[in-house]
Amino acid sequence: MSLRFIYGRAGSGKSQYCLNSIKNRIEEDIDRPLILLVPEQFSFQAEKNLIEVLDEKTGFKTQVLSFKRMAYRVFNEVGGITAKHMNESGKSMLLYNIIEDNKNNLKVFKKAAKRQGFITTISDIITEFKRYNITPEIILNNLENIEGDNLKYKMEDLALIFSQFETRLHKNYIDNEDDLTILVEKLNKSKQFDNAEIWIDEFSSFSPQEYSVLEKLLLKSYRINITLCTDYLNQGRFVDTTDVFSPIKNTENKLLQIIEDNNIKLDKPIALKCDPCARFKNSAELQHLEKNMFSFPYKEYKNETKDICMLKTLNQFTEIENTAKDIIKLCIDKGCRFKDIAVITGDLEGYENIISSVFLQYNIPFFIDKKREINNNPIIVLILSALEVLSKNWTYESVFRYLKTGLLDINNEEMDILENYVLANGIKGYQWTNDKPWEHKSFSNYELEDQALKELLAKINDIRYKAMEPIVTLNKNFKSIDKAKEFCEVLYEFLCNINLPDKIQNMIEDFKVEGEIEKASEYNQIWNIVMEVLDQIVEVIGEEKISLKEFFKILQTGFSEYEIGLIPPTLDQVMVGSITRLRSHNINTLYIVGVNDGIFPSPLKEEGILSDDDREFLGDKGLEIAKDTKSIAFEEQFLVYSTLTTPSKYLRLSYPIADGEGKTLRPSIIISRIKKIFANICEENDIVKLNGEEEELKNISSAKPTFNYLISNLRKDVEGVKIDNIWGDTYKWYLENEFWIEKLNRLIKGFDYTNQSKYIETKKIRNLYGKPLKISVSRVEKFSQCPFAYFVQYGLKAKDRKIFNLSYPDLGIFMHSILEKFSHELEKKGLEWGTMDLNWAEEEIDKLINEELDNKSLDILNSSKRYEYVTKSVKKILKRSIWLIGEHIKRGNFKPSYYELSFDIDGDYPPIAMELHSGEVINLIGRVDRVDLLQKDGATYLKIIDYKSGIKEFKLSDVYYGLQLQLLIYLDAILTELAERSGINGEPGALLYLKLDDPIVKNTVDMSDEEIEKSIIKNLKMKGLILNDPNVIRDMDNIISGISDIIPVMVKKDGGVSEGRSSVATKEEFETLRKYVRYTIIEICEEMLEGNIEIKPYKKKDGSSCDYCIYSSVCKFDTNIRGNKYNILIDKKDEEVWDAIKKKLEYKNI
């Protein structure tokens, strides 16, 4: 019985010493068991290394074990294990059930128990307790020593959960954490390790459970040799936590305590001093890094480095692209093998997709060493979404998550037809399961003939029944059961009914044929996992009564704990992984990417259920559990040391200065430390692009990425930019390669590509737009925004998918309709806006809205609680609006005369006719919300008001560019009709936008009702253009003094209008605007009919017409594509607009 330490710094040859010692023992033919004990994740590599040292005949004489393998060997030898193993999934499901049963008894975790991830947190703390040999009884016995209610109640809750978990678990099961506890007991009966010599390698620390096992082994074995990665032995002295080797020295001290307690001999240690160490014999730089990274003071390396390099990049993508180029270069120039290379990071989740994409492009074989979660696998999605459909009552999201798994007998076309119909009609809940066929006519933005409509509805119902039948049957079977095992049986029957096992097998075969071995392996494991989870539910809580929702939650919890590991498909490949999972020392070349602050070293972890203070307090009371986050942070430096000393030939550290979203990233403290040690370190960056052949050569690596660089340079050449001669030679290589020549020629032809088609034939455009042209004024404005968008919307009639929701236009139309009906009701009853009874008015608004809802004119407002709230808001807005209109009318002499005045063949006025230069007449149609009239001095003044549910400004600049024409053309048309039809001398009074809203007034505590009303009136002040006539202005606001709070006007003390602070125009200017608007509409319509469909969106300083355009995926507008340019509109001042309009009219002789 003895213990011997084999110690030395990283790379000193400790693992090799162990292997050589084993070889020597075999050659000496010593008759005792020889054991090599390593961590589980190192077992494969250790066996491989052992075989390389020993020959095939002698290799079997040594056992390579992990603690878990050792437990199984002993259990097989001495027996005693009758219970089955419960995996992490079963453990989580059991914990979920325990917490649900006891949620009302929990003092601290009652609310937390509902949070996602809580089960995992509880599972982790129970695992921790077991590893540290803490039982529920130990916790309960220590409760009286705990001060402070919060920690005491926490520990009471944990004791309750832990106690019930142990009781229910050990009826038929044990979990993985019980293995070592049982192993300690069984080792007394085992003979396997009697007089054995054991070598323990690659451990930096042990759990209390493992120390207990080691204690037993020390008492049974001949000798235990333990490797320690440290510069010197501590020999029981106090450990400085800032020492990089402090975790190792703590381990040494604990082992020394064990042998002292058991009177076990300590053999003379083996000190592996090296200069250089075996690993770094070919690199003085890496040896210097190992010695000085955590030495204080450090020794500076003055020479330029070639084995240690740094790379600073613009972002993560260019970082990985540069890494790929460097790997290719190393393999070509230095004959490096892919299997000798590793790429690691502290943020594998953030890097793995980029690495996969780039390495595939560069044809670098790689394997990402991580376990994959299974929640996104279609098989798991199908099972959970099927249950979610029933537990959440057939919501759109759950139904189509189920249908879109690709595992059902519904093709994509059928899926699209069904989904479009469901979205258009808001189908959910009972509508899926009732026996009546769906008969809603609204399933598309397009009109269909009756027969086609009937056929499509019949098809939709067929698809519906096919989609819902398996789930309806599942639901029916669920209703007659209440035990967990019965739920599992019914679910399994459902999976068989939809032929899922056969479909999975077919998919696995297809994946194998297509060479997707990883996918085949994944799907093969998933079905076994599903069966395992169902079996565990039956075994653990099979007889318990549960609801469907509980079954869904238990399954969800069970699946969430599973991760699948994949086997590397080939040996010669780059290993990609996390810094914490770096397994092999046989790595020549190591790339550490993402060496940024907060990534490597990793930041402090969250404290978890037990805070650092809790852990410290419990430790002081004798309850030793895992270290607090501060201690772990100190130990992180040993991980840094181990990582940096892994490669034997080449190390490169890289860091981006920004992430994928452009957020700034700072380099890690590791970067600055290494720069201090290596003053002339090899450092590159891709932020500043250098020119020259040497730089361009870096872009020539694998065929595919080099091809992309070639195309980029050829495009520059076409655009007249000088490129390096090297690309001419590269072009020739691809031109002579049969695989690439066709693709090369096709892309070169693409240099002439443009998405523009400025004009189409007049005949075709006539067929699309109709003849004679009948068009609304808003559509004319749409053409001014972008001719192509107009063409797609009104020519091709492309429309967005119809969805059952309430859009702003729908709501605006609804409110306009109610206001129109209310206005006519006023007229019918002989009432006036200024004198109407507000109580009656508000009741009338309620009545009109309720009638509309009863008539289902806007059925969606009856569809949910949310829309009931919207209805209430609409009522408040309209009530506020009629009050506001009444206030406006009280303040003036204009009288409302027309509501929803229409221009159309059957309208109040005929369409607005305009003659083009060709002699053709176009007809403009439209509708004015309200027209108020004022009889004054033998003239009739018009005030045209447009109701808006959003903010709308009046800008002369927009009039000039053809973006704001409606109110002016309506004014012109009404004045023309009054003169021609009735001989009335009409004059412009005002063009105004009135916002329909119920604004919130802040700080109303000290305000009277009158002050609040004034604030609302001011808040809803109308925007527009007013006649510059003080008398007419006073007829709109008879109490105006200074700035009006209802119209955009300010009057001076002398009664005149302050033109600089008002939006006004003279009669002459109104006349000019009328002429200009007519001229502009004619110009626009002629462009339209000539076939102009140019992709030319406008752009102003506050945005462009592309901002909310739904056709961007059609036009693919991109200023990098030839011919794609914005129509830049510069906001002009009013004076500039008047000058520009007058000049244009003079030029056209108008």
From Swiss-Prot:
Cofactor binding description: Binds 1 [4Fe-4S] cluster.
EC number(s) from the headed UniProt entry: 3.1.-.-
UniProt keywords, alphabetically: 4Fe-4S, ATP-binding, DNA damage, DNA repair, DNA-binding, Exonuclease, Helicase, Hydrolase, Iron, Iron-sulfur, Metal-binding, Nuclease, Nucleotide-binding
Taxonomic superkingdom: Bacteria
Binding site for [4Fe-4S] cluster: 786, 1106, 1109, 1115
Amino acids binding ATP: 8-15
Additional free-text comment from the UniProt record: Despite having conserved helicase domains, this subunit does not have helicase activity.
Function (record text): The heterodimer acts as both an ATP-dependent DNA helicase and an ATP-dependent, dual-direction single-stranded exonuclease. Recognizes the chi site generating a DNA molecule suitable for the initiation of homologous recombination. The AddB subunit has 5' -> 3' nuclease activity but not helicase activity.
NCBIfam families: addB_Gpos
Assembly: Heterodimer of AddA and AddB.
Family named by the database record: Belongs to the helicase family. AddB/RexB type 1 subfamily.
UniProt protein name: ATP-dependent helicase/deoxyribonuclease subunit B
Organism: Clostridium botulinum (strain Okra / Type B1)
